[in-house]
Regions:
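Histidine-centered divalent metal-coordination motifs
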Residues: 91, 95
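Long, well-structured alpha-helical subdomains associated
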Residues: 6-17, 118-148
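Short, solvent-exposed loop/turn segments at secondary-structure junctions
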Residues: 51-55, 73-75, 90, 103-104, ...
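Active-site scaffold of zinc-dependent metalloenzymes
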Residues: 49-83, 96-100
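Surface-exposed helix-capping loop/turn segments at secondary-structure junctions
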Residues: 35-44, 103-105, 143-148
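Post-HEXXH active-site segment of zinc metalloproteases
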Residues: 83, 87, 99-130
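Auxiliary, metal-adjacent structural segments of Zn-dependent hydrolase domains
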Residues: 2, 6-64
Length: 148
C-alpha cells in the first residue's frame, strides 16, 4: 500500500481553490493512481510537498519529493486553467513515481534546462518525459470526468 501525504503550501491551496480543485479529492486521487501504478503488499509512506511558483512552468526535484507548480498561464477561463494546473500536477507526479517507485536516477533524464525550454528531441523524446506527458493526458481527463 502506497500512501502519499500531500503538503500543499498556502499559495498553491489558494491557486487550486481559485479553479475549484478540492485538495483532499486530489490527494485521494493521487493515492489511487500510485497504488494502481505500482501494486505492493509493503507499506510505503511518502510526504510530497507541493508549492506554487511565479512562472509558467512546473518542476519536480528528484530525491526531494518536492513539486513546484507555476501559476502563470495564458488560459483564460476557469475550465482551461483547471486543466492546465491539473496536467502540470500529474506530469510532475509521474516524475515523483519514477523517482520513488521505479527508482529512476535523475541522470536518466539526460537533458538540460535549455533542451526543456526549447522542447527539442533530447527533452521531448526522453522516455521518462514521454511517460510524464502520457500521465498528464490520461489522469487529467479522468480526474475532470470524475469530479466535474
Amino acid at each position: 500500500v502506497i500512501t502519499v501525504e500531500c503538503k500543499f503550501n498556502s499559495k498553491v491551496k489558494e491557486l487550486l481553490k481559485s479553479v475549484d480543485i478540492n485538495i483532499k479529492e486530489l490527494e485521494r486521487y493521487t493515492n489511487f493512481i500510485l497504488n494502481e501504478y505500482k501494486g505492493t503488499r509493503k507499506f510505503w509512506f511518502y510526504e510530497l510537498t507541493i508549492k506554487m511558483i511565479e512562472c509558467d512552468t512546473s518542476g519536480y526535484y528528484f530525491g526531494e519529493n518536492h513539486i513546484e507548480l507555476g501559476n502563470k498561464t495564458l488560459k483564460r477561463n476557469i475550465e482551461q486553467k483547471r486543466k492546465w494546473y491539473l496536467s502540470s500536477y500529474f506530469h510532475e507526479l509521474c516524475h515523483f513515481a519514477q523517482d520513488n517507485l521505479d527508482k529512476v536516477k535523475e541522470s536518466k533524464l539526460n537533458y538540460t534546462d535549455k533542451d526543456a525550454s526549447e522542447c527539442n528531441n533530447n527533452y521531448y523524446k526522453n522516455p521518462y518525459e514521454v511517460q510524464a506527458r502520457e500521465w498528464e493526458e490520461k489522469y487529467t481527463e479522468a480526474y475532470i470526468s470524475i469530479y466535474y
